[in-house]
């Protein structure tokens, strides 16, 4: 009930406070309360209005959490906005919360011993109560036709979408009743009660659903919501569903037939009750609706100047009736899809003729940017059907003829409700015909589970999936494989398959014998490349942009696999993805990640021949998943071929979110690379070239199945599509090969970012970076990160010319010239190396500066010699190998010099990133350093370079110096004045090469612990962070830093200064620009090919002499005066102060 009854009294008190409360759904509510009310009383006062129990509320004002025992007046919140967030449930409550009796599909998954632990809150407004949400289906046709991919917002439980529809309608009816009560009791409402009623957030999903439904007349009544808001509010409907019966007994029922979950579906009588209640509400609303029409009819001309009270009353009526109409319309839409098939045998129940995605707008999250802060437990849907599912009622009933029926959540529910312990073949036939192969991706945050189905129809997986009949309940080959890992054993621990991929049978029987199958792969027809590329591009691209990410956990799921031999066929051990580049979710992680893999214990499964002839499309698709999602085995060719990565998620584990991008990094994909330690200059090539696997050929993929198995053109098309999805919000054109330089220049609006010689890009490394960015597109970079060296091969002429001109200064590429140029170049990095290691503890006796400089000289000497001498077709592969080798050895060397302390090495890298990123968005820098730390840990855990390989580079204090070349080049002076060499060197390029190591060794352990430690560290840094939901922390921190930090502004123009008040102009002008004579001379000498007679240092000292500076000042003044006299475009009227600045008298 609204707290308005007490607030009207509070308004009469002389010392009342008007407090604005803003919730996570961006709604602001106004409360007028007594000034002496304490915070705890205020929480209880607003609990009903905000739908959050008082004990779970956290009120934040000016970065501080309001304490319960203090008074509101003490915080001076009168007329101010207080932010309200909901406290995350304690970790100890997670398992019990998962067993809440709210009626979701896993209500009893914890064994059912604690059904009432949540207390009354579970049936009230506990948004953290357990709920399942169906994310939809994705069908891949076998005829090569295009596949349309949509991102939709959808709320539908795996258990029963009709039930959710009724529950949502009941919630909305209660909301309408609340609104009617407020209109009928006018005196007990607040002055500004125009905000949505207490329960309105529960209908956000329906509101979103209406937005894209052009055929529904009530569309106009559903105001569009922001994706963030709608996602957050979508989680509530199923959490407040006391009507849903516990699904504990369900598992026993589903075994006989897939439709045995019918008891969870609502009966027609329940639908009738809801409709009757709607009729009563309409009768109650009628008088207010008439008054509403009267007010609106006269609204254009009514004069409220002297009738403030009347205006308030009319405005209040308009708001409340409008909100009631919105809820009423949404209720009708939710109920309009419910049908009862009278042809079915009794007892009949309701089903849904069209899924919620029917109403939603495709690509809802297209505008989402990275990093995304999300609310734990949000719902995101990905659906895409090669053929539209028939809306007929029979489709939901899993009729044998409905090949697309699986796209409807109800029929999907039949899949997930079947139990692992149901060996009888009886239940198999119905789903066998209605479900093609399924790839399921599920997400669990706290308790809600998000799932996605990808249905891959091959020529033999239609109703004719008879070959799989021997597998009993498994249905068609592909479908059965996904069935085995679905929610088997509700009573014990309902598990969800994160990803299940049916495997070609001949590839699975012998894991080590996988390589022979590569021939079939290479011989597979490429007719469906376009379709596959389009499908995977949209799928991966949209997954990378979604806030909802894959959750992984591990129960003891071996029995599930054992009960389904064909399922075991698809169960290769899944490498635990490295949780690095999930910017969208790093802030939302609320607990540790328990990840494990289940290997099919039934060896007979792989040998089963049910799906005898996998199509070429299937083979290509499975290998493509291997490339993108990472091979499933530690190196066996079989898993690499089929890539059936399966991970089981358990609801009881603490909350964790990991990005779909982690699958791109699993064992072969390319993760965002950690930058090399600041010293290494050879990184210029590595900046973009570092591929994951050993650069020579396609060894990045285990089992001998290199990237060549898939045509580079096909891989390129997939990458192009993924990047188009990711960069579409930044204006990137589809299919565009825009260079990185052009892309950044277009976003920044500056034309000189990558021009050689421009500010911030001086020196050799800056020019090299410019060359790479001007010639490489985003697609080229991703190709390099995945081990394809073709972009480097294409760049060979430009690189060779560049090194000849900028590196050798036009001299002959002899060994002595190369060594001398390398020495000069690397020596210029000494100050950056010293600065980078100044704050870390180095091993006693080790000369870290010399160690790095001499190591870099040797590595870069090899790279430069290769670029200048190699002319054959192995240029790209060898260059890639040199960069990878240099990176790994550099990391191993510095780790050894730092005593094996990974934290010290990470501090060196992150310190350099922060120094290079001054003025950059702090949240982006924070994300970058966190991501680099995670990736660095993965790289170091699978380091292919041993200590013995790098000991020869270690230099001790007192060791004799290395023999120096005869004469350093003049480039050294320019290098010392520019921070760019280090910037290039410290760029996050080569980290992705860890994939090579990961493919050689066992799958990496999950990095959840590391992420949690970092989250904890960031929370400790700010006292308020512990009381704020994780997704709010980066937002608040960014606001704090942006208020503290003022970006440097460019110098003001003369015209601007002339219009400024004199007093302010004096304070703004300062001493004028700094004279950079030494820089100008170095640049001119380099352009002319001249070199100083002495050393660059002595030249710099000479140029800094006062008399030289004064002469330079006079010469500069004279040049400007001459320019002002001769330039026809100069106008003294436009620049009135120019004569004073550059007059003859200083």
Curated annotation (Swiss-Prot):
Residues that bear Phosphoserine: 96, 978, 987, 1095, 1131
Keywords in alphabetical order: Acetylation, Apoptosis, Chaperone, Chromatin regulator, Cytoplasm, Differentiation, Immunity, Nucleus, Phosphoprotein, Repeat, Secreted, Spermatogenesis, Transport
CDD domains: Ubl_BAG6 (cd01809)
MF annotations from Gene Ontology: Hsp70 protein binding; misfolded protein binding; molecular adaptor activity; molecular function activator activity; polyubiquitin modification-dependent protein binding; proteasome binding; protein carrier chaperone; receptor ligand activity
Record's compositionally biased regions (Low complexity): 96-108, 394-413, 555-573, 583-601, 1021-1034, 1080-1090
Biased composition (Pro residues): 239-257, 422-433, 502-515, 603-614, 670-694
Pfam families named among the record's database cross-references: BAG6, Bag6_BAGS, ubiquitin
Motif, Nuclear localization site: chain positions: 1026-1068
Compositional bias of kind Basic and acidic residues: 977-986
Residue numbers of Phosphothreonine PTMs: 117, 1067
Region (4 X 29 AA approximate repeats): 236-650
Residues covered by region (Sufficient for the delivery of client proteins to the endoplasmic reticulum): 1036-1146
Role this protein plays: ATP-independent molecular chaperone preventing the aggregation of misfolded and hydrophobic patches-containing proteins. Functions as part of a cytosolic protein quality control complex, the BAG6/BAT3 complex, which maintains these client proteins in a soluble state and participates in their proper delivery to the endoplasmic reticulum or alternatively can promote their sorting to the proteasome where they undergo degradation. The BAG6/BAT3 complex is involved in the post-translational delivery of tail-anchored/type II transmembrane proteins to the endoplasmic reticulum membrane.
Summary of subunit composition and partner proteins: Component of the BAG6/BAT3 complex, also named BAT3 complex, at least composed of BAG6, UBL4A and GET4/TRC35. Interacts with GET4; the interaction is direct and localizes BAG6 in the cytosol. Interacts with UBL4A; the interaction is direct and required for UBL4A protein stability. Interacts with AIFM1. Interacts with HSPA2. Interacts with CTCFL. Interacts with p300/EP300. Interacts (via ubiquitin-like domain) with RNF126; required for BAG6-dependent ubiquitination of proteins mislocalized to the cytosol.
Protein name: Large proline-rich protein BAG6
Organism: Rattus norvegicus (Rat)
Taxonomic lineage of the native organism: Eukaryota, Metazoa, Chordata, Craniata, Vertebrata
């Amino acid at each position: 009930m609204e707290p308005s009854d007490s607030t009207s009294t509070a308004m009469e008190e002389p010392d009342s406070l008007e407090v604005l409360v803003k919730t996570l759904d961006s709604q602001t509510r106004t409360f007028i309360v007594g000034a002496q009310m304490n915070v705890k009383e205020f929480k209880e006062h607003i609990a009903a209005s905000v739908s959050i129990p008082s004990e779970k509320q956290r009120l934040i004002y000016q970065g501080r959490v309001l304490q319960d025992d203090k008074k509101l007046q003490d915080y001076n919140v009168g007329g101010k906005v207080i932010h309200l967030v909901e406290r995350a449930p304690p970790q100890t409550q997670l398992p019990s919360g998962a067993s809440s009796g709210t009626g979701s599909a896993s209500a009893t998954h914890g064994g059912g011993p604690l059904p009432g632990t949540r207390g009354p809150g579970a049936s009230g407004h506990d948004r953290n109560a357990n709920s399942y949400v169906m994310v939809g289906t994705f069908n891949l046709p076998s005829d090569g036709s295009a596949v349309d991919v949509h991102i939709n917002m959808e709320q539908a439980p795996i258990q029963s979408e009709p039930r959710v529809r009724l529950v949502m309608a009941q919630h909305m009816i209660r909301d309408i009743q609340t609104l009617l009560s407020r209109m009928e009791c006018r005196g007990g409402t607040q002055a500004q009660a125009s905000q949505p009623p207490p329960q309105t957030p529960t209908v956000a999903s329906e509101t979103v659903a209406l937005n894209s439904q052009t055929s529904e007349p009530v569309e106009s009544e559903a105001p569009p919501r922001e994706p963030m808001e709608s996602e957050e509010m979508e989680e509530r409907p199923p959490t407040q569903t006391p009507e849903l019966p516990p699904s504990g007994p369900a598992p026993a029922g589903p075994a006989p037939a897939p439709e045995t979950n019918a008891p969870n579906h609502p009966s027609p009588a329940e639908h009738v009750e809801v409709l009757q209640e709607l009729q009563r509400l309409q009768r109650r609303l009628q008088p207010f609706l008439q008054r509403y029409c009267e007010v609106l009819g006269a609204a254009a001309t009514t004069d409220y100047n002297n009738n403030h009270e009347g205006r308030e009353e009319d405005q209040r009526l308009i708001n409340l009736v409008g909100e009631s109409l919105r809820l009423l319309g949404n209720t009708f839409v939710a109920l309009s899809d419910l049908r009862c098939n009278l042809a079915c045998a009794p007892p009949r129940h309701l089903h849904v003729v069209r899924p919620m995605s029917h109403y939603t707008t495709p690509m809802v999250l297209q505008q989402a940017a990275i990093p995304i802060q999300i609310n734990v437990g949000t719902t995101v849907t990905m659906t895409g059907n090669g053929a539209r599912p028939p809306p007929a009622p029979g489709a939901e009933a899993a009729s044998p003829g409905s090949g697309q029926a699986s796209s409807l959540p109800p029929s999907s529910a039949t899949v997930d409700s079947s139990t692992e312990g149901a060996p009888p073949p009886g239940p198999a036939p119905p789903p066998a015909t209605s479900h093609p192969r399924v790839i399921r991706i599920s997400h669990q945050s706290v308790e809600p589970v998000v799932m996605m189905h990808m249905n891959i129809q091959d020529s033999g997986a239609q109703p004719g999936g008879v070959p799989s009949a021997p597998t009993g309940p498994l249905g068609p080959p592909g479908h059965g494989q996904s069935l085995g890992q679905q929610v088997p054993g509700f009573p014990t621990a309902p598990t969800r398959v994160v990803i299940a991929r049916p495997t070609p049978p001949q590839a699975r029987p012998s894991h080590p014998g996988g390589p022979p199958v590569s021939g079939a792969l290479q011989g597979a027809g490429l007719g469906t490349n376009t379709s596959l590329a389009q499908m995977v591009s949209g799928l991966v691209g949209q997954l990378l942009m979604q806030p909802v990410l894959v959750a992984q956990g591990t129960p003891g799921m071996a029995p599930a696999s054992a009960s389904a031999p064909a399922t075991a066929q698809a169960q290769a051990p899944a490498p635990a993805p490295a949780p690095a580049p999930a910017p969208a979710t790093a802030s939302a992680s609320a607990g540790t990640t328990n990840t494990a893999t289940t290997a099919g214990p039934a060896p007979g499964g792989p040998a089963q021949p049910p799906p005898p002839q996998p199509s070429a499309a299937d083979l290509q698709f499975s290998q493509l998943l291997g490339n993108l999602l990472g091979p499933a085995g530690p190196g066996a060719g079989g898993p690499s071929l089929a890539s059936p990565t399966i991970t089981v998620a358990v609801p009881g584990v603490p909350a964790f979110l990991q990005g779909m991008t982690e699958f791109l990094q699993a064992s072969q994909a390319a993760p965002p690379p950690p930058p090399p330690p600041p010293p290494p200059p050879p990184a210029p090539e590595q900046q973009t070239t570092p591929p994951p696997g050993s650069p020579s050929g396609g060894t990045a993929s285990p089992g001998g199945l290199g990237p060549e198995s898939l045509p580079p053109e096909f891989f390129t098309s997939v990458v192009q599509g993924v990047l188009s999805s990711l960069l579409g919000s930044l204006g990137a054109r589809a299919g565009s090969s825009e260079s990185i330089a052009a892309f950044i220049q277009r976003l920044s609006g500056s034309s000189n970012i990558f021009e050689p010689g421009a500010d911030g890009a001086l020196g050799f490394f800056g020019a090299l970076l410019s060359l790479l960015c001007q010639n490489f597109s985003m697609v080229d970079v991703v190709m390099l990160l995945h081990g394809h060296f073709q972009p480097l091969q294409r760049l060979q002429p430009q690189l060779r010319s560049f090194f000849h001109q900028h590196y050798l200064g036009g001299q002959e590429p002899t060994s002595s010239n190369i060594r001398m140029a390398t020495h000069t170049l690397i020596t210029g990095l000494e100050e950056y190396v010293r600065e980078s290691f100044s704050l870390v503890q180095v091993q006693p006796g080790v000369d870290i500066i010399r160690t790095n400089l001499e190591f870099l000289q040797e590595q870069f000497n090899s790279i430069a010699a290769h670029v200048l001498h190699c002319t054959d077709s192995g240029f790209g592969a060898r260059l890639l190998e040199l960069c990878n080798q240099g990176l790994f050895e550099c990391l191993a060397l510095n780790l050894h010099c730092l005593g094996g302390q990974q934290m010290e090495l990470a501090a060196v890298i992150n310190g350099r990133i922060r120094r290079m990123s001054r003025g950059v968005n702090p949240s982006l820098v924070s994300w970058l350093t966190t991501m680099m730390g995670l990736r660095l840990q993965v790289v170091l855990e699978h380091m292919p370079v041993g200590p013995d390989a790098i000991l020869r580079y270690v230099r001790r204090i007192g060791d004799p110096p290395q023999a120096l070349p005869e004469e350093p080049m003049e480039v050294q002076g320019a290098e010392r004045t520019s921070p760019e060499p280090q910037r290039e060197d410290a760029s996050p390029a080569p980290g992705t090469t860890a994939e090579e190591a990961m493919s050689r060794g066992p799958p990496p352990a999950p990095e959840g612990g590391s992420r949690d430690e970092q989250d904890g560290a960031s929370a400790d840094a700010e006292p308020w962070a512990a009381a704020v939901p994780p997704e709010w922390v980066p937002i608040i921190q960014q606001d704090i830093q942006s208020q503290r930090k003022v970006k440097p502004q460019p110098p003001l123009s003369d015209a601007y200064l002339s219009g400024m008040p004199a007093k302010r102009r004096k304070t703004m002008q300062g001493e004028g620009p700094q004279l950079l004579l030494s820089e100008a001379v170095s640049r001119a000498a380099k352009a002319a090919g001249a070199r100083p007679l002495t050393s660059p240092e002595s030249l710099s000292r000479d140029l800094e002499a006062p008399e030289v500076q004064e002469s330079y000042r006079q010469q500069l003044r004279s040049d400007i005066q001459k320019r002002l006299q001769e330039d026809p475009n100069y106008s003294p009227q436009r620049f009135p102060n120019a004569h004073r600045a550059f007059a003859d008298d200083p």
